[in-house]
Amino acid sequence: MKTEVTENIFEQAWDGFKGTNWRDKASVTRFVQENYKPYDGDESFLAGPTERTLKVKKIIEDTKNHYEEVGFPFDTDRVTSIDKIPAGYIDANDKELELIYGMQNSELFRLNFMPRGGLRVAEKILTEHGLSVDPGLHDVLSQTMTSVNDGIFRAYTSAIRKARHAHTVTGLPDAYSRGRIIGVYARLALYGADYLMKEKAKEWDAITEINDDNIRLKEEINMQYQALQEVVNFGALYGLDVSRPAMNVKEAIQWVNIAYMAVCRVINGAATSLGRVPIVLDIFAERDLARGTFTEQEIQEFVDDFILKLRTMKFARAAAYDELYSGDPTFITTSMAGMGNDGRHRVTKMDYRFLNTLDTIGNAPEPNLTVLWDSKLPYSFKRYSMSMSHKHSSIQYEGVETMAKDGYGEMSCISCCVSPLDPENEEGRHNLQYFGARVNVLKAMLTGLNGGYDDVHKDYKVFDIEPVRDEILDYDTVMENFDKSLNWLTDTYVDAMNIIHYMTDKYNYEAVQMAFLPTKVRANMGFGICGFANTVDSLSAIKYAKVKTLRDENGYIYDYEVEGDFPRYGEDDDRADDIAKLVMKMYHEKLASHKLYKNAEATVSLLTITSNVAYSKQTGNSPVHKGVFLNEDGTVNKSKLEFFSPGANPSNKAKGGWLQNLRSLAKLEFKDANDGISLTTQVSPRALGKTRDEQVDNLVQILDGYFTPGALINGTEFAGQHVNLNVMDLKDVYDKIMRGEDVIVRISGYCVNTKYLTPEQKQELTERVFHEVLSNDDEEVMHTSNI
C-alpha cells in the first residue's frame, strides 16, 4: 500500500541523523560526511550465517548447477521491463524464506530478452542456445524498433569498418550495451522515489532556454522521472512502498536492492556496478543497533541475503561476448573503506560485514569486492582484508592517494574493474563513464611498420602510411612511424566512441541509472589499451638491442630477429619504464585533443579483462613475442602463439620479483591513465614469510608501500592505483584449474571461477608469473619511513 509521503514521514525516517545540507537537495555524499562513524576495531564483532541463509544459498546453488547441465530458461516472448515482469522469488513456494526481495526476472535464473542494444544480437543469443524468439514479437520489433546497433552501423565510417575488420579497433560496445554507469542507489533508501521525482520535476521546470542541449536534457529528465515511477511499481510487486524513504537498515538494504534490480531488469551493460553502498548502510545499522531495533546477527543476515540476491544476477550473452569477458562476470563492484577529506578514514563495520560474506555464504566472484586502500586505514582492517585475500583471493585494492590527485573525491567508487568514478562530484567531473573497451596498440604499430597493411593478412590495407623499409630498425624512425599510426588509431577510435554513445543515448538511454544521479553530469570517456607490455618491450628492443626485420619477396615484414639484451617493462629499469610512460602520454594526449560526445573527458585504462587472449589471436609476430600467422590455405595458425599479458601487467618474460613489477607500474603517470592501471598478481605464500601471520603482515606492508607516494621509490611521488591480489601456489591450483574444478581467482579487473574459462584462457592464466620471490635484489627494502 502506498504511503502519502509527508514531512512527518521524513522526520520519522531521518530521526537521529545529523546535518541539514543533505536534506533539501539529494546528496548521499553530504549525508555520509555528516553521519558516518569510523570504526577502529577488529572483526571480533562479526556474526556467522544462519540456517535460513544457508538454505537460501543451497537453493540458489542447486538451481544454477541444474541449469548449467540442462540449459538456462530464456524469455522468448516478452521484452524485458522494470515493472511489467512479475515479481520473482528464490522459492516461489516459500516466499517468506527471503528477507530482502527483488529479482531480475519472474523466475530464478530466467534470462531477460533485451533487444534494444541490438535485435540481431539478442536473437542470435537465443539461437546459440537452441531457441528462437516468438515470431510475432520479432515482426513487431523488426518493424517498429531501431536498436543501438542499427544506429551505430548507419553512422560508422569506412575507416572504422576497416579497423574493426582488421581487429585493431574491436570489442567495442557496438554489439552489446555499454555499462559502466553507476547510479547512487542509496538515494532511494535515503530519500524515497517521491522525493527524487519531485526534484527531477523542479530541475525540468528550471530549464527555460530552448536549444539543442536543453531540449535533449529535458527529454532525458522526463525519462528519468518515468523510470522512477517504474521503480515504485517494481517495489509494489513485492508489497514494498519505495516512494518513501527507508525507516531502518533492513529497509535501506531492501530499497537499494529494488533500485539495483530495477536496473538489471532493463540494462545489460558490460558492467553493472553497485557503487559506494556499505558506508551508507552502516549509518542506518549503527542507528538501529543503538536503538535495539536489530541485533548484529540480524544485520549480517540481511547483508548475506542481499549478497545472495546479487549473486543471482545473470545476463543472456553471445558467444562472441564471452570471448572478451569470460566467466560470465557482471561486475557488481562494491567499494568500501577509503579516506575522507577531513583526514578521517572511512572504514565502517559494514565493510567488515560485506567482506565477511566470503565466509558466511562462501567465496564467489560476485559482488566484485573492492577496498579503497590508504596506509592510514586502521591496521586491524588492513590486516583483516589481507587475511581474507590470503584465504579467498577474491578482493581487489585501489589506491586512494593516486586517484585523489586527479579529482576523485571522498565518495568515489569503482566501476566495472578498476575505473574510478565520483557520481555525485559537484565540480562536474568523473560522474559517469562512457565505456570504450580497448584497442590493440601493438597491432597498430606493427601495421604501421608495414605501410598500413595488416600484420597478419598482408593483402589487407587498413590505413595509409609510409612503411619503414630499414632492415635494422632505427628507434627514431620507428617512433616517427608509430606516432603517425597512433594518430590514425586515436582518430578512428574517437569517431567510433562518439557514434556509439550518441546512438546509445538515442536508442537505449539508461534512464533508471541516470535517475539516481545528479541531473547535470559530465562523463569520462574510457579509452583502453591492449598489448601494452609488448609494445613497450618492442620499442625497448629496437632502442637498446638490434632488431632485424624478416621480409617476404614483396618487402612485407613477417617476423623479427633480436640480437643483444634490452630492458623490459616490469624490471624496474627506467630505460624501459620511461618508454612505457611515453607511450601512455602520446596515446592520452592524442585522445584528449579531440572533441568528445557531450564534452566528455578523455580517460585511458590499462585493462583487458580476458580479451588479452582474444587480441593475442589477432596479432602477428612482434620483436618480443610470437603471434599468429597464415597457413597457405589462408587459415590462421596459432601453434607458436604467446599470449599478451593482461592489463598493465609486464610480460611473462620480464625478469624480477613482485616488487620490481610494482615499481614499474608505480612510475606510470595516473593522469595519462586515470581510467585505471590494472595489475593482476599471483604471489606464493612462501614468498611472503614462513607463517601465515608473517605472510599477512607482509602483505599489509607491501600494499601500504605500493599505494603510498614515494614509499616504493624513494625521492619520488610514484604510487600505484590497483592490485588484483591472488595468494596461491601454481602447483596447488594448476590441476584443479585444468580439470575444471571451482577455483576463484582475480584476473584483469574482476574475479572469476576458472571452471568457466576456455581452454586457451586457462592456459594463459597458468602461464602467468606466479611470484615465488618478492624481489631479485637481496638488499631490497621499501622506504617505510615514507608511509
UniProtKB/Swiss-Prot annotation:
Several mechanisms have been proposed based on complexes formed with substrate analogs. After activation by the glycine radical, the cysteine radical, Cys-417, can abstract hydrogen atoms from the other active site cysteine, Cys-416, and from coenzyme A, and it can also transfer hydrogen atoms to product radicals. The other active site cysteine can attack the central carbonyl of pyruvate and covalently bind the product acetyl group. The modification Glycine radical is found at residue 749. It is found in: Cytoplasm. Belongs to the glycyl radical enzyme (GRE) family. PFL subfamily. Keywords: Acyltransferase, Carbohydrate metabolism, Cytoplasm, Glucose metabolism, Organic radical, Transferase. One of its GO terms (molecular function) is formate C-acetyltransferase activity. Homodimer. The keyword Acyltransferase applies. This is Formate acetyltransferase. Pathway: Fermentation; pyruvate fermentation; formate from pyruvate: step 1/1. It holds the Pfam family PFL-like. It is an enzyme of class 2 (transferase). GO terms for biological process: glucose metabolic process. It comes from the Bacteria. Residues 645-774 form the Glycine radical domain. One of its GO terms (cellular component) is cytosol. It catalyses: formate + acetyl-CoA = pyruvate + CoA.
